[in-house]
């Protein structure tokens, strides 16, 4: 699947739901949390009437990244579930009791067992934050200062300050655009 096409599919999927729950893996690292909070805040800035929640357990040492949400799942009407930075269902944090209609997945880990209606997995990317940044740069989703800061932190953290082998020219180009 061509990358430009996946951006359109993801944007269309986000646009078509009024309620969205964004989850990531248990025991989150900066890439998981920052991609989750960055995407949530971007969707909220772009579509202020949508109900968008970032869920899962809080981590005290990462509190400065932003606050997570605690929605009443019973009041939600089959929201879209977006899973970030998690390859399998049993590692998704914060979705117990959630009745969702579809799953949209963005991840840089190899595919495992999550059944999705839209899935973008690219193991050549440095981080899920890099992928979310590329999505935002190629759609009408807004990048606020806080969104850019979180996505930058996630990229720097998961690439171990640009030292891992999956750090590429596109990693630097994407990160540069966050700094502009």
Residue ranges and their predicted role:
Residues 25, 57-58, 84-87, 106-109, ...:
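Fold-independent oxyanion-binding glycine-rich loops
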Residues 33-35, 89, 111, 162:
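General alpha-helical segment detector with a strong preference for membrane-spanning helices
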Residues 2-4, 48, 72, 99, ...:
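Serine/threonine-rich low-complexity intrinsically disordered regions
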Residues 64-118:
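Active-site cofactor/cluster-binding pocket
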Residues 19-21, 51-53, 80-81, 101-104, ...:
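Structural motif
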Residues 2-20, 26, 38-44, 114-180:
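A structured phosphate/pyrophosphate-recognition subdomain
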Residues 3, 50-58, 80-92, 172-180:
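Short, surface-exposed, charge-dense and proline/glycine-enriched linear segments
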Residues 18-79:
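Anionic-ligand anchoring segments at beta-strand to alpha-helix junctions in alpha/beta enzyme folds, i.e.
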């Amino acid at each position: 699947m061509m990358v430009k096409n996946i951006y359109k599919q993801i944007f269309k999927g986000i646009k078509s739901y009024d309620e969205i729950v964004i989850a990531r893996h248990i025991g989150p690292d900066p890439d998981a949390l920052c991609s989750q909070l960055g995407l949530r805040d971007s969707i909220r800035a772009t579509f202020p009437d949508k109900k968008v929640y970032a869920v899962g357990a809080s981590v005290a040492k990462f509190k400065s990244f932003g606050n997570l949400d605690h929605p009443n799942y019973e009041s939600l009407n089959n929201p879209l579930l977006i899973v970030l930075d998690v390859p399998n269902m049993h590692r998704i944090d914060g979705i117990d009791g959630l009745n969702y209609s579809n799953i949209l997945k963005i991840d840089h880990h190899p595919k495992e067992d999550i059944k999705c209606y839209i899935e973008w997995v690219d193991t050549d990317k440095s981080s899920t934050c890099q992928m979310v940044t590329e999505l935002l740069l190629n759609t009408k989703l807004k990048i606020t200062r806080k969104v850019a800061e979180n996505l930058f932190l996630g990229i720097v953290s998961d690439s171990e300050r640009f030292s891992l082998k999956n750090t590429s020219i596109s990693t630097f180009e994407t990160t540069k655009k966050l700094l502009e």
